[in-house]
């Protein structure tokens, strides 16, 4: 193989590595992180909020204790926001410094954070709704509800950690 042919192949590979659609996937990762995490947070807030509303009729004295699931569901959206802001700062126009590997890493990180946030929000909403309703029947259920909510919240935290590792490369 001649040196001219090798140079043509090397130039073609470099052009593919610095494709013009790279920033699209980086931006899609940013969008995925925020949109899915916010959707999970919204579901968790709504589901836990309806449980609080139904519990407050019988036991209005426990409303401030019962608001914890709503706060924890809101934190899931903050995880998505943190990842979206950090990853968006690393998305660059297509060129020598921004490769497909960077773009796909940012896309994967955003998707991981978003989908973990979606799952965490759903888990917090369902567990929070059941926990708040149980709290109105038996106030000693508070510690058990908090433990279950912490385990659900950690799902979103793990997603954020993995997303920051992927998006930082």
Curated annotation (Swiss-Prot):
Record-linked Pfam families: ATP-synt_C (PF00137)
GO cellular component entries: membrane; membrane raft; proton-transporting V-type ATPase, V0 domain
Topological region Cytoplasmic: 45-66, 128-145
GO biological process, one term: lysosomal lumen acidification
Tissues where the protein occurs: Adult H-shaped excretory cell and rectum.
Keyword Membrane appears in the UniProt entry: yes
Recorded topology in the membrane: Multi-pass membrane protein
Record-linked NCBIfam families: V_ATP_synt_C (TIGR01100)
Name this protein carries in UniProt: V-type proton ATPase 16 kDa proteolipid subunit c 1
UniProt keyword Ribonucleoprotein present: no
Function in brief: Proton-conducting pore forming subunit of the V0 complex of vacuolar(H+)-ATPase (V-ATPase), a multisubunit enzyme composed of a peripheral complex (V1) that hydrolyzes ATP and a membrane integral complex (V0) that translocates protons. V-ATPase is responsible for acidifying and maintaining the pH of intracellular compartments and in some cell types, is targeted to the plasma membrane, where it is responsible for acidifying the extracellular environment.
Marked site (Essential for proton translocation) residue numbers: 153
